[in-house]
C-alpha cells in the first residue's frame, strides 16, 4: 500500500436528504496493518487493525479484541474524573465495542489463531450524530485494508422510523420524533444479488407510547421487518465505498495465515462409530442436569475408546466430540423438528412468575422459564440519586439504571465474582432499552429507579428472562408502567438452504445453532431486539418470519405474567414517598435562603429531603407521607403564600429576642413581633423587665395576630391558651 491519502464516499439518499459517509486511508496510523478514518458530518472516527506475528496455537478460540476509545476532546470537553483524563471505558464505549465485534467476528476465516486487535478512536463528534455506526464502518474499512482473511467489507447504518418513514443516519432531533431506532450491519452476498443481515441492535424510543397516542404508526413486527429492508440500500452503498477505498489504496493481497483445524475427519468418523448411538440417546434426555451427566459419561467413554488410536491428538478428540454433538443436535431439529429437550420448534418451556418474593425491598419478582431463573429487584429513590454519566452521549444523567448479574453458580460452575464483564453490561443495557419506552415520565413518577436482574439459573436467554422479571418487579414496586413487557430468544438452524427457526432456545441450542435473536415488546409493538449470528449473514425474510414467530411466544408469556400481577401494586411501606410542588422561578432563591439556610431548616423540621430543579419544580422525598406534606406546606408558605389575617392563631417558634420584645416565626420566611408590653399575660399580669425572663429562643408559643400594618409587618400577642398555660405553671 502506498503512503498517499485515498478517499471514497458513500452517499445515502433518505427522505430527510442525503447522508454522506466519507472514508479515508493513508494519512493516519500508517504502521497498523490497516487503518481508516470514517466521517459523518463532523464526526470523525479513526480505526486501526493490527495482527500478531505469531499465532497462539494453544488457544481453542479466535483471539479478536475490539476497543473503542472515547476522547472527550472530541466534544470539546475535559473529563470529569479526578485526574481529568480518560480512564476505563464508559458503558457507551463498551456497547459500541460489542456492536463492532458481533458482525466482524464471524467474517474472519475459521481456525485463525493470530491475535487481532481493532481500536476505534473517536476524534471528533458532531453534536447532531451518534458515533457508534461510524465506528462500525471505520472498523470494517481498516480490517478490509489489513490483508487479513476477512469476508468483508461490512456496512452498518442506523435507521429511525420517523413519521411513518425509515430514515438512514438520523440526527438527534429526528430520533426524538422516531418511534423506533435500529442499528443494522450486513454485507453484500457474493453474487451481489442481496444484502445479508449480520447484526441488529434496536429499540423503541422513550417517546414511542406518546407518539403512537398522537397518531404515529406503532413499530409492529411488520414495520420492523420493513426497517431491515430499508437498511439494505445504505449497507450496499457503504460496502461499495469501502471496496472502492481498498481498490484506490492498492490493498495488498490477502496474506497467508496459519489456520488451525480443530479436528480432522478421521477423528470425527472414529468417534461417530464408537459412541454415536449413545451420544444420540443422551441428547434426547429432556432435563439439563440429567442430560449433562450422561453426556459427561459418554464423553469419557469416547476418550477411552479412541485415545489409543489417536495418541498425541487429544485436543482433536475433544473438538471432534463437540462437532459430533453439534451435528446430531442440528440433524434432529432439521429432520424431525424435535429439539434436545423434546420440544417442537415453536414450543415454550414451562413458565412461572411470582411477585413480592423478598421482604423489605421496594419491589421483587421471580421469573422462571424452564431452568432459566431470574430474580428481579427494584429500588426507588430521590431523583438526586440518578446516575451521572461522563461520556460523549448528550444525555448526562440516567434516571433508570438496569444492572444485570451473572454469577458462576447460575451454570453450576465456579468462577470469578466481581465487577461486571462486557457481556453483563451488554445484557443489562438490552433489558434497560426494552423497558425504557414504557416507563412513566419524571413528572408522572418522580423517582430514580434501579433495577437489578440476578441470573440465578441459566439455560437459555437470561437477558430476556430479565426483561420479564423486571416488568413484574417494577409493577410490584408500584411503578405505573405504560404496558407490561416480555421477551423471548429465537434461534436458527441452517442446513441445505433451509432455515428452521426455534422459539425459546436452550443454552446448547445457542451454542450449536446459527443465530441468537432476542425480541422484547408489549402486546402491541416491539420495544427492543438484538441479533447475533455465526453465519456470514441471514436473509431479511428469515428474520421477518422469526419476528412473527416470536410475537406468539411473547403474548403467551405476557398472559402468564398477567396472572401474577396485572396492575401496579401499592408502593412498599419501606419505599420513600416523593411528591412535587411547582413554584415560580423567581421564588427559588427565597426557598433556598441565604447559604441554604431556609431549605436546610425545612429539611431539619420535616425530616424530608428536598431537590430543587431549575424550572421551579421541587421534589420532596421522605420516609412517610406526613413528613413530605409538612415540607410541602413549608415551601408553599414561602413561595405560594396566603397572606395572614388579623385574628389568626399560629403555633410559632421564638427565633430572636431583643430588649423590646421577641420575633416569632409563624411560617418559613414570615415572622411577627411579640412586643415586650404584651408579655404581661405570661407573667401573671406583672410588667416584664427582661424578655429573657419569660421567653427563650426555640420555644414554641401559641400566638395571635393583632395587627398588620401597611408595610406588612405583623404584631402579635400571646393567645388566651398561652396565657392560661403560663398561669397554670
UniProtKB/Swiss-Prot annotation:
The keyword Nucleotidyltransferase applies. GO terms for molecular function: 3'-5'-RNA exonuclease activity; magnesium ion binding; polyribonucleotide nucleotidyltransferase activity; RNA binding. The keyword Magnesium applies. Residues 576-635 form the KH domain. GO terms for biological process: mRNA catabolic process; RNA processing. Mg(2+) binds at residues 510, 516. It catalyses: RNA(n+1) + phosphate = RNA(n) + a ribonucleoside 5'-diphosphate. InterPro entries: ExoRNase_PH_dom1, ExoRNase_PH_dom2_sf, GPSI/PNP, KH_dom, KH_dom_type_1, KH_dom_type_1_sf, NA-bd_OB-fold, PNPase. Keywords: Cytoplasm, Magnesium, Metal-binding, Nucleotidyltransferase, RNA-binding, Transferase. It is an enzyme of class 2 (transferase). Its EC number is 2.7.7.8. It is found in: Cytoplasm. One of its GO terms (cellular component) is cytosol. Pfam families: KH_1, PNPase, RNase_PH, S1. Transmembrane segments: none annotated. Residues 647-719 form the S1 motif domain. Its cofactor is Mg(2+). Belongs to the polyribonucleotide nucleotidyltransferase family. PANTHER family: POLYRIBONUCLEOTIDE NUCLEOTIDYLTRANSFERASE, POLYRIBONUCLEOTIDE NUCLEOTIDYLTRANSFERASE 1, MITOCHONDRIAL. Involved in mRNA degradation. Catalyzes the phosphorolysis of single-stranded polyribonucleotides processively in the 3'- to 5'-direction. This is Polyribonucleotide nucleotidyltransferase.
Amino acid at each position: 500500500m502506498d503512503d498517499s491519502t485515498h478517499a471514497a464516499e458513500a452517499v445515502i439518499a433518505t427522505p430527510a436528504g442525503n447522508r454522506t459517509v466519507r472514508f479515508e486511508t493513508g494519512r493516519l496510523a500508517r504502521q497498523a496493518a490497516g487503518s481508516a478514518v470514517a466521517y459523518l458530518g463532523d464526526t470523525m472516527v479513526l480505526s486501526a487493525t493490527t495482527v500478531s506475528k505469531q499465532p497462539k496455537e494453544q488457544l481453542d478460540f479466535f483471539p479478536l479484541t475490539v476497543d473503542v476509545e472515547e476522547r472527550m476532546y472530541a466534544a470539546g470537553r475535559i473529563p470529569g474524573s479526578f485526574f481529568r483524563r480518560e480512564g476505563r471505558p464508559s458503558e457507551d464505549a463498551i456497547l459500541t465495542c460489542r456492536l463492532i465485534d458481533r458482525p466482524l467476528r464471524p467474517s474472519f476465516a475459521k481456525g485463525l489463531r493470530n491475535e487481532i486487535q481493532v481500536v476505534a478512536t473517536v476524534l471528533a463528534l458532531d453534536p447532531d450524530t451518534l458515533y457508534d455506526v461510524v465506528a462500525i464502518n471505520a472498523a470494517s474499512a481498516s480490517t478490509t485494508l489489513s490483508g487479513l482473511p476477512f469476508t468483508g467489507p461490512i456496512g452498518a447504518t442506523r435507521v429511525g422510523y420517523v413519521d411513518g418513514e425509515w430514515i438512514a443516519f438520523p440526527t438527534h432531533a429526528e430520533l426524538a420524533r422516531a418511534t423506533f431506532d435500529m442499528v443494522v450491519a450486513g454485507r453484500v452476498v457474493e453474487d451481489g444479488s442481496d444484502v445479508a443481515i449480520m447484526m441488529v441492535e434496536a429499540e423503541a424510543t422513550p417517546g414511542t407510547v406518546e407518539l403512537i397516542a398522537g397518531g404515529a404508526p406503532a413499530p409492529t413486527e411488520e414495520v420492523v421487518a420493513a426497517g431491515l429492508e430499508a437498511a439494505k440500500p445504505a449497507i450496499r452503498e457503504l460496502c461499495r465505498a469501502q471496496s472502492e477505498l481498498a481498490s484506490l489504496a492498492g490493498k495488498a493481497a490477502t496474506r497467508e495465515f496459519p489456520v488451525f483445524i480443530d479436528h480432522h475427519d478421521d477423528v470425527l468418523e472414529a468417534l461417530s462409530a464408537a459412541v454415536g448411538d449413545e451420544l444420540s440417546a443422551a441428547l434426547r434426555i429432556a432435563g439439563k442436569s440429567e442430560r449433562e451427566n450422561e453426556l459427561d459419561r459418554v464423553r469419557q467413554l469416547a476418550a477411552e475408546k479412541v485415545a489409543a488410536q489417536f495418541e498425541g491428538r487429544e485436543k482433536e478428540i475433544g473438538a471432534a466430540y463437540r462437532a459430533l454433538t453439534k451435528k446430531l443436535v442440528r440433524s434432529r431439529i432439521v429432520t424431525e423438528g424435535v429439539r434436545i429437550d423434546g420440544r417442537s420448534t415453536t414450543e415454550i418451556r414451562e413458565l412461572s412468575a411470582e411477585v413480592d418474593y423478598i421482604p423489605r425491598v421496594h419491589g421483587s419478582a421471580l421469573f422462571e422459564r424452564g431452568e432459566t431463573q431470574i430474580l428481579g429487584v427494584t429500588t426507588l429513590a430521590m431523583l438526586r440519586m440518578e446516575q451521572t454519566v461522563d461520556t460523549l452521549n448528550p444525555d448526562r444523567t440516567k434516571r433508570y439504571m438496569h444492572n444485570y448479574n451473572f454469577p458462576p453458580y447460575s451454570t453450576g460452575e465456579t468462577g470469578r465474582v466481581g465487577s461486571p464483564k462486557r457481556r453483563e453490561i451488554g445484557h443489562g443495557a438490552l433489558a434497560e432499552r426494552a423497558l425504557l419506552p414504557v416507563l412513566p415520565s419524571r413528572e408522572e413518577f418522580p423517582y430514580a429507579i434501579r433495577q437489578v436482574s440476578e441470573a440465578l439459573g441459566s439455560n437459555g436467554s437470561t437477558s430476556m428472562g430479565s426483561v420479564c422479571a423486571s416488568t413484574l418487579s417494577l409493577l410490584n414496586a408500584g411503578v405505573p408502567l405504560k404496558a407490561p413487557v416480555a421477551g423471548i430468544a429465537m434461534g436458527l438452524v441452517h442446513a441445505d438452504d433451509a432455515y428452521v427457526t426455534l422459539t425459546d432456545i436452550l443454552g446448547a441450542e445457542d451454542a450449536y445453532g446459527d443465530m441468537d435473536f432476542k425480541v422484547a415488546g408489549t402486546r402491541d409493538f416491539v420495544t427492543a431486539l438484538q441479533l447475533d449470528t455465526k453465519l456470514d449473514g441471514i436473509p431479511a425474510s428469515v428474520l421477518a418470519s422469526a419476528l412473527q414467530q416470536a410475537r406468539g411466544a411473547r403474548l403467551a408469556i405476557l398472559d402468564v405474567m398477567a396472572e401474577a400481577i396485572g396492575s401496579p401494586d401499592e408502593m412498599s411501606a419501606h419505599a420513600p414517598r416523593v411528591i412535587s410542588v411547582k413554584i415560580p422561578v423567581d421564588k427559588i432563591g427565597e426557598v433556598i435562603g441565604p447559604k441554604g439556610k431556609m431549605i436546610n431548616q425545612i429539611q431539619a423540621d420535616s425530616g424530608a429531603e428536598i431537590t430543587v430543579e431549575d424550572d421551579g419544580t421541587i421534589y420532596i422525598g421522605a420516609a412517610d407521607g406526613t413528613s413530605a406534606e409538612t415540607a410541602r406546606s413549608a415551601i408553599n408558605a414561602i413561595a405560594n403564600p396566603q397572606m395572614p389575617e388579623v385574628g389568626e392563631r399560629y403555633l410559632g417558634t421564638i427565633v430572636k429576642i431583643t430588649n423590646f420584645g421577641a420575633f416569632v416565626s409563624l411560617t418559613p420566611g414570615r415572622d411577627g413581633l411579640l412586643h415586650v408590653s404584651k408579655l404581661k399575660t405570661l407573667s401573671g399580669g406583672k410588667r416584664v423587665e427582661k424578655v429573657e425572663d419569660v421567653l427563650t429562643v426555640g420555644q414554641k408559643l401559641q400566638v395571635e395576630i393583632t395587627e398588620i400594618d401597611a408595610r406588612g409587618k405583623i404584631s402579635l400577642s400571646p393567645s388566651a391558651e398561652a396565657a392560661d398555660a403560663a398561669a397554670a405553671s
